[in-house]
Swiss-Prot record:
Disulfide bonds: none
Cross-referenced InterPro entries: Glyco_hydro_68, Glyco_hydro_beta-prop_sf
GO biological processes: carbohydrate utilization
Name this polypeptide is given: Inactive levansucrase
Organism: Geobacillus stearothermophilus (Bacillus stearothermophilus)
One Gene Ontology MF term: levansucrase activity
Length: 473
């Protein structure tokens, strides 16, 4: 038994009892080792105070995902018999959409609507200048079933699904894909993975000619980012915990290569557990707010979920051969708020770095946020590594609250920077998979988001074609 850990837990339990009895102030003064603490671990935080402002703020139309006309929505004609959901474009090093021999390329998750375990990465392409949903073509899956075995990688051989990621057009004209290797064989183990995708072009089509340099990069170090073994040791699925290590987004800065990804904090930068409920840094604002909100949280049915909530947008540096060079601190964390901040995205625009993530209200512990609420949250910094401050004062960028059964339900919102101007294109998928016989999950209509320093707003009447990536190009 770890005696130090046991003593710390006992102290927390004593303080919890005091708070529940309404004796918060007395507990603060009784013993120094029972006092709340403030520890940022040198990273930025999505605070409870900021999130509690969102239910009122989200009523403003400038944060609301536009309403779409369901009668105009089409399936992707080339993706016959497939649901298509999370997608990401082939991007240049600066985040703008790459021109690959006259084509735009998108990678997307797709699968059989009748088989929830069928999740693979497909490639789609359209000629530059075309925007119609019908102009998207596909050569099919990126990987053959045998590729994971041919790679001679001890982790890859146990992959059962392919999850979201990113893709970059390298300086030597290659396509480098990053994605999440998911293994259903090992309690949902997730590994950041990469491969070079070889694509040949003609005047009328693109073809996939196999992959090379296919390898695992990172699966958590336990100290900075939770790994699957910690999840298993603490009770795996029965514990109520939600282990994440996925959605790698590639970014370059000052000649260095990085991946930013969805994760959970590790033992040295604010791990999950009851002790986290007493860290003022996770609450924000003031000591008086902390006292009020922490007591309320401890008495609520969300306290167990809150103590397990330690979502993070993590960061690692890569070597030039795309192997792991350095594990870095998270750019931001969501301790006590949510365990799941997805689709990490970061880009530089007009001298500022913008960081965004998607999250579901059903995974949150914030009063006033409902299970149907869907968000894109955003943050801004003067440097890639932070510190990051919330856009629009709270971090709210986009909100959507349609019933998941609605044909025009959207998720996985992703900001695509443009070559010039203050607008980004927002892409997403529409219609949840397997819900309709005739309506497949598909590219949602894109729309514009305007960014002015620390403020954003949805551009009115800016709905674009389904899956459209660029404007004025």
């Amino acid at each position: 038994m770890n005696i130090k850990k046991f003593a710390k837990q006992a102290t927390v339990l004593t303080f919890t009892t005091a708070l529940l009895a309404g004796g918060a102030t007395q507990a603060f003064a009784k013993e120094t080792n029972q006092k709340p603490y403030k520890e940022t671990y040198g990273i930025s935080h999505i605070t409870r105070h900021d999130m509690l402002q969102i239910p009122e703020q989200q009523k403003n139309e400038k944060y609301q995902v536009p309403e779409f006309d369901s009668s105009t929505i089409k399936n992707i004609s080339s993706a016959k018999g497939l649901d298509v959901w999370d997608s990401w474009p082939l991007q240049n090093a600066d985040g703008t959409v790459a021109n690959y021999h006259g084509y735009h390329i998108v990678f997307a998750l797709a699968g059989d609507p009748k088989n929830a375990d069928d999740t693979s990465i497909y490639m789609f392409y359209q000629k530059v200048g075309e925007t119609s949903i019908d102009s998207w073509k596909t050569p099919g899956r990126v990987f053959k079933d045998s590729d994971k075995f041919d790679a001679n990688d001890s982790i890859l051989k146990d992959q059962t699904q392919e999850w979201s990621g990113s893709a970059t057009f390298t300086s030597d004209g290659k396509i480098r894909l990053f994605y999440t290797d998911f293994s259903g064989k090992h309690y949902g183990k997730q590994t950041l993975t990469t491969a070079q995708v070889n694509v040949s072009a003609s005047d009328s089509s693109l073809n996939i000619n196999g992959v090379e340099d296919y390898k695992s990069i990172f699966d958590g170090d336990s100290k900075t980012y939770q790994n699957v073994q910690q999840f298993i040791d603490e009770g795996n699925y029965s514990s109520g915990d939600n282990h994440t290590l996925r959605d790698p987004h590639y970014v370059e800065d000052k000649g260095h290569k990085y991946l930013v990804f969805e994760a959970n904090t590790g033992t040295e930068d604010g791990y999950q557990g009851e002790e986290s409920l007493f860290n003022k840094a996770y609450y924000g604002k003031s000591t008086s707010f902390f006292r009020q909100e922490s007591q309320k949280l401890l008495q609520s049915d969300k306290n167990r979920t809150a103590e397990l909530a330690n979502g993070a947008l993590g960061m690692i540096e890569l070597n030039d051969d795309y192997t792991l060079k350095k594990v870095m601190k998270p750019l931001i964390a969501s301790n006590t708020v949510t365990d799941e901040i997805e689709r990490a995205n970061v880009f530089k625009m007009n001298g500022k770095w913008y960081l965004s993530t998607d999250s579901r209200g059903s995974q949150m512990t914030i009063d006033g946020i409902t299970s149907n609420d869907i968000y894109m949250l955003g943050y801004v910094s003067n440097s890639l590594t932070g510190p990051y401050k919330p856009l629009n004062k709270t971090g709210l960028v986009l909100k959507m609250d349609l019933d998941p059964n609605d044909v025009t339900f959207t998720y996985s919102h992703f900001a695509v920077p443009q070559a010039t101007g203050n607008n980004v294109v927002i892409t997403s998928y529409m219609t949840n998979r397997g819900f309709y016989a005739d309506k497949q999950s598909t590219f949602a209509p894109s729309f514009l988001l305007n960014i002015q320093g620390k403020k954003t707003s949805v551009v009115k009447a800016s709905i674009l074609d389904q899956g459209q990536l660029t404007v004025n190009q």
